[in-house]
């Protein structure tokens, strides 16, 4: 796995040293919908309230990539700035699992206190966990010994409303930082698409048993 990390030079070096010396929790943020997706932008805004934030996320959508990693091509990782805020952001040409590997092994100067992935546009319950790039990123962080959480909202729209779930994201992440997550485990948090008044609370449950009904749209190629 070759990698190339392009930075803005001294300013990013200074910021990384600052993070190394900071007493705030160091939070690694990623997703599978791409670094510009509204879900990850909402997640970043919440994480900025809890600690020092480093974002390493795919430069394009990587949904349903599972735990794939890049082997036969070069990974490119570029410093960018999507929104205002104290967070440091990198876009990566690879998969969500690649982003974790790059963040932990190449970009960060110390192991993050927690990794959060999402917020995914759509559910990651049941068998979706196997296909999910969002959860695979969280699991990759867990393999690295980092407490990790994957967040998903049952709303596939690009303009989904994430404001309702922000307080719950903050509460869950804050608790995970304080109390920890058992080693080798990752949390899979799924939010229903509800109004704030309809949300009754947080419930811990087993992974559901379900499967997709496979349907294929068959077409005849005009070039055959």
Residue ranges and their predicted role:
Residues 123-132:
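Glycine/threonine-rich flexible loop motifs
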Residues 22-23, 27-30, 38-106, 110-111:
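A cross-family phosphate/adenosyl-ligand binding-site feature
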Residues 142-164:
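Glycine-rich phosphate/pyrophosphate-binding loops
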Residues 10-20:
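Short, Lys/Arg-enriched N-terminal segments with co-localized hydrophobic residues
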Residues 114:
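Short, Asp-centered acidic motifs that coordinate Mg2+ and/or phosphate
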Residues 103-109, 136-147:
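Alpha-helix C-terminal capping segments
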Residues 163-224:
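Electrostatically charged, flexible surface regions
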């Amino acid at each position: 796995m070759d990698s190339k990390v392009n930075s803005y030079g001294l300013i990013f070096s200074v910021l990384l040293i600052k993070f190394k010396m900071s007493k705030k929790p160091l939070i690694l943020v990623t997703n599978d919908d791409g670094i510009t997706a509204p879900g990850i932008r909402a997640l970043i805004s919440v994480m900025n309230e809890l600690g020092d934030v480093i974002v390493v996320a795919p430069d394009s959508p990587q949904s349903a990539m599972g735990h794939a990693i890049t082997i036969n091509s070069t990974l490119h990782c570029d410093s960018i700035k999507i929104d205002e805020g104290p967070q440091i952001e990198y876009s990566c040409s690879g998969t969500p699992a690649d982003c974790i590997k790059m963040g932990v092994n190449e970009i960060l100067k110390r192991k993050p206190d927690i990794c959060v992935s999402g917020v995914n546009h759509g559910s990651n319950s049941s068998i979706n966990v196997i296909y999910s790039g969002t959860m695979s990123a969280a699991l990759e962080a867990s393999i690295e010994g980092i407490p990790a959480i994957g967040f998903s909202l049952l709303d596939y729209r690009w303009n989904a409303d994430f404001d309702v779930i922000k307080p719950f994201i903050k509460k869950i992440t804050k608790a995970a930082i304080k109390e920890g997550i058992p080693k080798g485990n990752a949390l899979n948090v799924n939010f229903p698409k509800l109004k704030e008044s309809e949300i009754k609370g947080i419930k811990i449950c087993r992974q559901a048993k379900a499967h997709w009904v496979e349907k294929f749209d068959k077409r005849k190629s005009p070039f055959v």
